[in-house]
Regions:
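Helix-hairpin-helix/helix-loop-helix acidic hairpins
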Residues: 2-31
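Solvent-exposed soluble domains appended to multi-pass membrane proteins
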Residues: 20-34, 38-41, 46-391
Length: 391
């Protein structure tokens, strides 16, 4: 572990209280403890970011029109892969910048690690993690236990096993239906937190016959025409399934008054994104940044009074680093925030993305370099010091 973690230059443990004191984000804390569902959606991506995509059907009509929602883009660390890195960012709010040489769940020990799991348990939540595929993938069966999830579920607990054509992965619709059974079995007298990793849209995208595609790109992608059609079909199915899930929670609230807030984000773009990206829409790191930007949505089955706090008016794509999604979700839920989460939200206002090919970004999405603004530099470096201590 020690060899895998990079200590930031100039790190001083004694300075951490002063660094944490820079967190200025006011708390929107309430007495509510809504149920929380955090979904890592396999390969969910918006190709209109990198190509003039034209298709014969809308791809995400549900998510794009969903009322009472926050929409934007989370920026993952990698292009075309790296699910477990994104999972690590979601659960710990730690950037992979300090652990660049390892796949987190395979290379780090998470016993007693700080994460959203432990934090929500400290607030009285019961916790569950689920994935409709093999438990051994990314060592999840071990690491989820180390993180302290009260219960974990894998393929055998998703009995529907509905797939799309010849693709071997359970559909999101079936995954959500099976998950509802697991969710309803959780203790009813406590607030519930669930982390769900989907599998439907995993590559590759040449498994089905052309006749099975339900969406067809009008844009010419040459050798990637079928690949794009199958992928876009999966995206539309994911969108429809999310609508079904929201309908389930809407009915739950109407029947029982149980509040639920949901966040879903794509883990990364599909692997072929670089082959179909239009260089006219960006060059070099600018294009890479777009390839790393995956859709997210936060929605609740009850009114969200502070949704504006999660919008960045300077950036039409409302981009944020993946490490900032969970504190944004907790803020929207009205929960008390740790100093670490409050610092991340303060950082988001000044430098929304700190992980990856650029030093960091400004609120409008443009790149910033260290040395241009001392106060902002200090805020970014302070995060990495706090992260190192967090690890």
């Amino acid at each position: 572990l020690d060899d895998a973690v990079i200590q930031p230059a100039g790190y001083d443990e004694a300075a951490l209280p002063d660094i944490a004191a820079a967190a200025e984000r006011p708390s929107a804390e309430t007495d509510d403890r809504p149920d929380i569902l955090l979904i890592l959606s396999e390969s969910l991506y918006d190709f209109s970011l990198v190509t003039d995509l034209q298709a014969d059907a809308e791809l995400m009509p549900v998510i794009n029109a969903l009322p009472n929602a926050v929409r934007g883009h989370t920026v993952s660390a990698n292009v075309g892969g790296g699910t477990n890195v994104t999972e690590y960012e979601m659960l710990t709010s730690n950037s992979p910048m300090l652990v660049p040489t390892v796949t987190p769940f395979n290379g780090l020990d998470f016993s007693d690690a700080n994460s959203v799991v432990g934090y929500l348990k400290s607030l009285g939540y019961t916790t569950m993690a689920a994935h409709p595929y093999a438990a051994s993938n990314y060592n999840r069966d071990v690491v989820w236990q180390q993180l302290g999830f009260d219960e974990t579920h894998f393929m055998q607990d998703f009995p529907t096993q509905e797939t799309y054509g010849a693709r071997p992965y359970q559909t999101d619709s079936a995954t959500y239906r099976d998950w509802q059974t697991l969710y309803e079995a959780m203790p009813a007298d406590k607030p519930r937190f669930s982390f769900l990793v989907s599998i439907q849209t995993h590559g590759d995208y040449t498994m089905n016959d052309d006749t099975q595609n339900i969406v067809h790109a009008a844009t010419d992608y040459g050798a990637f025409d079928h690949t794009m059609d199958e992928y876009l079909s999966c995206v539309q199915m994911s969108d429809a399934a999310f609508g079904e899930l929201c309908g389930y929670f809407t009915d739950l609230y109407a029947r029982t008054g149980r509040k639920v807030i949901v966040a879903m984000a794509g883990d990364h773009a599909p692997s072929f994104v670089a082959h179909v990206s239009d260089p006219a829409l960006g060059q070099g790191s600018e294009l890479t940044f777009l390839q790393r930007s995956t859709p997210f949505v936060i929605w609740a089955n009850y009114p969200l009074p502070h949704a504006d706090a999660a919008q960045n008016p300077a950036d039409p794509l409302n981009r944020m680093d993946m490490v900032m999604l969970t504190p944004t979700l907790l803020e929207q839920a009205g929960l008390p925030l740790s100093d670490y989460y409050r610092y991340l939200l303060t950082l988001k206002d000044a430098a929304p993305v700190v992980t990856g090919t650029q030093d960091y970004t400004l609120p409008d999405g443009s790149a910033a370099a260290f040395g241009e603004d001392a106060a902002r530099d200090s805020l970014v470096r302070g995060y990495f010091d706090l992260e190192y201590n967090n690890i």
